[in-house]
């Protein structure tokens, strides 16, 4: 009985936990994060506000005024008059082959540099990574000259309605061609993809490769049937990043594609700007519609994207 009776006394004698003291450093950190989120959301919210507002009202009252009407006319106008589905298809013709070729080439280089010991593997890896340190603006003039003087054969075209995809080239040159813009993206994205995939492949033990060699598999079979399935999370994460990087490109498409009908959707937005008048409300609606595909890709590959970033950070 004494033991049972003593239990409530012990509970009554316990001290209540002290309230956590709010430190000034934590307050400053939260204030900084809130300010960063506000700065990031402001352009997006402003674009949504401008896209929902009629341009006539903006011209009369200015951008910094309370809206009288909000509607989706700018979205419907951009979808129909700017032929948005055509430029979506135009962009996918550039992005999808560029992502696939970049992943294949980068995974091959990363596989050779991490799973085999040879004399210059580190040098080769550093050369691919060093390509990302070169500003694209440095090579504009020589690259533009190369594109204007590189002959490319033509093997006909694939015509689907208004869309016409030339097999290699329709003018005999690398300039103003889908293949040219695809190649430049592959060249500039392979270094970063090689760096990420090589770090991930370092977590794969070399005993797996050696066992496959003993079983009679050649190097190409090991890369395709053994290494790539193990790197699926990293490949999905890399595919998401590459899709976003290439899809959002404005510089290379504006420089290397002369024909407006061949440009991707990001650089095609510049075609809406007139010589004497720019409908910023319509451009804001177009920019929001152009952002939909990367969001869909990220949501679809989000699970693999997060797994690829976390699994590649530890070894073993």
Question: What positions do the PLM features span?
Answer:
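Short, Lys/Arg-rich, polar N-terminal cytosolic tail immediately upstream
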Residues: 1-22
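A structural signal for multi-pass alpha-helical bundles of membrane permease subunits
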Residues: 20, 25-316
